[in-house]
């Protein structure tokens, strides 16, 4: 198997004349300027390249983060809870499911698995990854789904879900204003959904 790293740069791109099947490793992350040899960035990019290669060959999962096997069924519980909360929000404010899909699309994450949105797939994991990316959870490490969730919960002081009390809890408030805010910054809405879902998903 012939592997090539897909890095933006200036110069000549050599064609693969080996006759071997080629798989191109693409990173979800911004790797920074090609000719800026900052040691910390270089170390990060080397780690990301390794993890991206492991993902390409099926050793880890995920879209942006390197996700290790889920040994205790945590992801299935999270996905089921997340989907239930999203459906409740959509009942209060029809169309919020489209906002959630827009967040996935804008950030480069897959759609939910259509036959079963709560199935423990890359699509089910995507909201958690998206929320972690938004809150700058380190991307050059590998995580189990549960560890990624715990790291996310430890990355903020003020709960992101507090920004959407009318949508998430049906509390008195401006549903119109919250819908507008969610539509303007759908990633923030998904982050709030993830926080609320994790609050209802046991980590221990």
Walk through the language-model features, giving the residues of each.
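Patatin-like phospholipase
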Residues: 3-204
């Amino acid at each position: 198997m012939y592997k090539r790293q897909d890095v933006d740069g200036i110069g000549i791109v050599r064609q693969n004349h080996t006759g071997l099947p080629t798989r191109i490793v693409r990173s979800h992350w911004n790797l920074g300027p090609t000719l800026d040899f900052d040691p910390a960035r270089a170390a990060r990019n080397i780690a990301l390249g390794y993890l991206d290669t492991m993902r390409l060959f099926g050793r880890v999962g995920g879209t942006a983060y390197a996700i290790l096997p889920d040994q205790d069924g945590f992801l299935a519980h999270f996905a089921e809870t997340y989907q239930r909360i999203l459906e409740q929000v959509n009942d209060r404010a029809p169309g919020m499911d489209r906002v959630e899909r827009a967040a996935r699309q804008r950030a480069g994450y897959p759609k939910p698995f259509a036959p079963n949105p709560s199935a423990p797939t890359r699509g089910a994991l995507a909201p958690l990854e998206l929320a972690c990316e938004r809150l700058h959870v380190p991307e050059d490490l590998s995580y189990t789904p549960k560890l990624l969730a715990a790291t996310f919960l430890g990355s903020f002081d003020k709960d992101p879900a507090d920004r959407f009390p009318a949508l998430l809890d049906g509390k008195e408030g401006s549903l119109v204003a919250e819908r507008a805010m969610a539509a303007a910054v759908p990633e923030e809405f998904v982050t709030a959904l993830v926080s609320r879902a994790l609050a209802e998903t046991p980590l221990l």
